[in-house]
Structure formats: C-alpha cells, structure tokens
Amino acid sequence: MKKFRFFVSGMPGVGKTTLAKRIADEIKREGFKVGGIITQEIRSGARRSGFRVIALDTGEIGRLAYVGQGYPRLGRYVIDVESFEKVAIPAISRALREGDLIVIDEIGPMEFKSNEFLKALGLVLRSEKPLLATVHRRFVERYRPLGEYYWLTPENREAVFSEILVKIKELLRENENAGNKAQD
C-alpha cells in the first residue's frame, strides 16, 4: 500500500469539515471503509456554544468543547478531554485496523489538549493508511511537508473537493488491486 496523505486548511467557516464529510460519504458509497472523526460546531441560536466529535463508522457522539467554567481551556471554551477521547481514540484505532481511508477533522489546538489524541495521530502518521485530515491554520507548516496540502477558500472548495476525491479514489483502487494481486 502506498502512503498518501491529504491535508486541508483554511479560515474558520470556509467548509473544511463539510469537505471532509462529503469525501468520506463519497468514498463509502464506492464500497470502501472510512473511519476516523469529524468535528462539528454546536450552536445556540446564532452563537457557537461548543464542538462535538462524531465517529465516522459508528455515529457515536462526544463533546469536544463547550462554553463554561473549567479546565483545560482554549479561549472561551472548556475542552472535555474525557468525552472527546471516549469517542475519538477508539474511532481512530478502528480506522487504523479496519479502514481503507482515515479521516481526522481536525488537527488543531483543542484536540492537542489530549495526549491520547497526539499518540493516536502519531500512529496514523506512521501507518500505511491513506489519510484525509483538516488542519488548523496554526499548524499548517507542521503538516504541509507530510503530504498534499490544500488551502480551502470559498472560490476553490468545489475544485479542491473534486481533486482530492479523484486522487483518493485512484489511490484506494490501486491499493485494492495491489491487495488482490498479492492474494493471487
């Protein structure tokens, strides 16, 4: 299996999570196994009140962050490390074992409050599994050298979606064919 990683970054609200979810859904429709996590905003009216993490394979939901009192903090958010790890770490572990594609949304400062997440991310980056990850803009330079990198904008998001989707499909088909040849 050939190593291939896709990293997507951009400003908040540009559509990084939407892109990751759309690609995951398309790859699943092709019959491949997709695992990992998606992070979504929690809103109270027009205001963001936190973030949840969702396991792509099971749909299990955990809380990543909320507005309130407590520690650890990032800005106005309290990071719920325990709830995040309860969903994210098993989801990433399953993706490493069983998935054809690993999706991690997001590699960012909230997630970095979890040492277990950092360990799991290290395992993913050392693995042979294809990876699609969204990266907080502060961490672009750290991850840019590790794979193909895209800066998402409202103007290019459809083109970036199409380009990454085509490349991942090609990669997964190559890996599938290589696996079939090895079994012959």
Curated annotation (Swiss-Prot):
Has nucleotide phosphatase activity towards ATP, GTP, CTP, TTP and UTP. May hydrolyze nucleoside diphosphates with lower efficiency. Belongs to the THEP1 NTPase family. Its EC number is 3.6.1.15. The lineage of its organism: Archaea, Methanobacteriati, Methanobacteriota, Thermococci, Thermococcales. The keyword Electron transport does not apply. This is Nucleoside-triphosphatase THEP1. The keyword ATP-binding applies. NCBIfam families: PRK13695.1. It catalyses: a ribonucleoside 5'-triphosphate + H2O = a ribonucleoside 5'-diphosphate + phosphate + H(+). One of its GO terms (molecular function) is ATP binding. Transmembrane segments: none annotated. ATP binds at residues 10-17, 101-108. Keywords: ATP-binding, Hydrolase, Nucleotide-binding.
